[in-house]
Amino acid sequence: MQDSPANVVQPDWLDDIQWTEDGLVPAIAQDADNGDILMMAWMNRESLRLTVEEGQAVYWSRSRGKLWRKGESSGHQQVLRDIRLDCDADVVLLKVEQKGGIACHTGRRSCFYRTLKDGQWVSADPVIKDPNTIYGSN
């Protein structure tokens, strides 16, 4: 592969993404080894760029209005193995190695732990670690 001349501006890969009016894109975190869906979070341009640069998931917290490095308080980082963009360019898929085996703030492996049974949402997956132990009690 040839190097590009220094004076040629390369297109920004972030420009290919269809961002929401708020400048966000939904991101799905998937276990790179077994395909389990771990969580969904939002990313802005900066968080997605940092995720690629640092090799660890960085999201945008809408409630806190700031960057959120996954695992910064729990230790349950997500190491980036692959990143994909869907056919409409409006959803990002992060294939990750989930450190500590817990992706959800409830202490479960996945945020998708509820299943619809007889018209009710019921918990289908166990708590691996008490969230108070992970984050401390209020």
From Swiss-Prot:
Pathway: Amino-acid biosynthesis; L-histidine biosynthesis; L-histidine from 5-phospho-alpha-D-ribose 1-diphosphate: step 3/9. The keyword Lyase does not apply. InterPro entries: PRA-CH, PRib_AMP_CycHydrolase_dom, PRib_AMP_CycHydrolase_sf. Zn(2+) binds at C87, C104, C111. Belongs to the PRA-CH family. Homodimer. This is Phosphoribosyl-AMP cyclohydrolase. The gene is hisI.
